[in-house]
Amino acid sequence: CEALKLAAQDCDQNSVSISFAPTKDSTINITNKNILHCAFMYTQILKDILLTINFDDSHINEFADNSSELVNVNEIAKEYRDHQPIWWYTRETFLFSVLNRALRLMDADIIIKMAFFISDLHKNITDLHSKQFHDQTSSQSFIVYRGQSLSQTDFNQLKQNQGGLLAFNNFLSTSKNRKTALDFIHRNLGKNEFVSILFVMHIDPSIYSTPFAHVPKINAIDEEEEILFSMHSVFRIGKIKQFSDNTQIWEAELTLTDNNDPQLRQLSETIQKETSGSTEWNRLGLLLIKLAKFDKAEALYTILLKQTIDQKEKANIFHQFGCINKDRGEYSKALEYYEKSLEIMKKTLPANHPSLATSYNNIGLVYYSMGEYSKALEYYEKSLEIRKKTLPANHPDLATSYNNIGLVYDSMGEYSKALEYYEKDLEISKKTL
């Protein structure tokens, strides 16, 4: 029985995923998926979301109602408020495994159902951190350890990103006891194609942007010297080397970062800019669309559509469904959703609202992709008309409209007209780029 427990714990420990941001010399670009890992941005935005949403008992009951097939779910529904979230997380229930799996796979459905618990656990760790480390300074820095098996792909990325940033996408269990981490490694040596690695983590207790806490006194399993970090803890990657006495094991030095880290601050600003949206959930959906995770984006917006009665929000969701299907190449479906969105916006927004211009423009894009150039021109011109009335003369959106109309005339063989609009686009671009 004890062996089975250890095997289950080892499996859960290895399921904690990591993601990488570019090194200091790399260009930050959301469209460069090899440089900026999707999961790094996903969990950062998810963390932002959970800090802005208020949860109550109805969310716990909803989770129980939708998860009745899971063991212990009724106990959790009845007794959830009787214990701290860390107690539930470290107890031998399904919560640990299901939550880490959802964060690893970026499963929007499960994450939304468990959002109340993710939020509560983060707040619990933050509160304990404040109590345990409130009077400590950088001079009292300490080291924690974590043993983990990495896939060869992740290990190669780790080596390639030395000097860059690494994020643990899940909640992260570590130990101040080096032997505890090494025991895990020795139990997993030689398994499959994985690389055994000991993370040696240097922790400045004065860093509050990444909460962590001692948990032995409230840990249901009651392991000693455990430090639990909240999700998306970000570290700077230092030296990576093989053990001198066992070349099967590698050691990687990590240093906890804070919000003052210039690269992390720049990255956070980029994430905010590239995924601006009306709500935090909408930001997450936009990110998934940008990274071509269309099924996950569709699942998220389907849930959001069921939860809202606000007409403007429905219009936005239908618009995003249109974007998803446009990018999939399913143009008839895209038109259907864009037109649903446009119908609502016409009823709820002023006649010259910028969102209407965006909607007309995107419908034009679909018709252009379908080769229906006269229809595309009709909608591009409607978009341009609004933009000329509401935007400054050198606004980039006007340049986009001129370029789009130029492309239509180009495709129709009307080259003099195409040239006229291309030149208008160029004139603005020279002033703004």
Which residues does each predicted region cover?
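Acidic, glycine-centered low-complexity repeats within long intrinsically disordered regions
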Residues: 336, 343, 357, 378, ...
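Mono-ADP-ribosyltransferase
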Residues: 1-347, 355-368, 378, 403-407
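Alpha-helix boundary/capping segments in eukaryotic regulatory proteins
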Residues: 329, 352-354, 371, 394-395
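Polar, glycosylation-prone regions of secreted, cell-surface, and some intracellular proteins
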Residues: 334, 346-348, 418, 430-432
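Short coil/turn linker motifs that delimit alpha-helical repeat modules in TPR/alpha-solenoid proteins
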Residues: 273, 310, 349-352, 391-394, ...
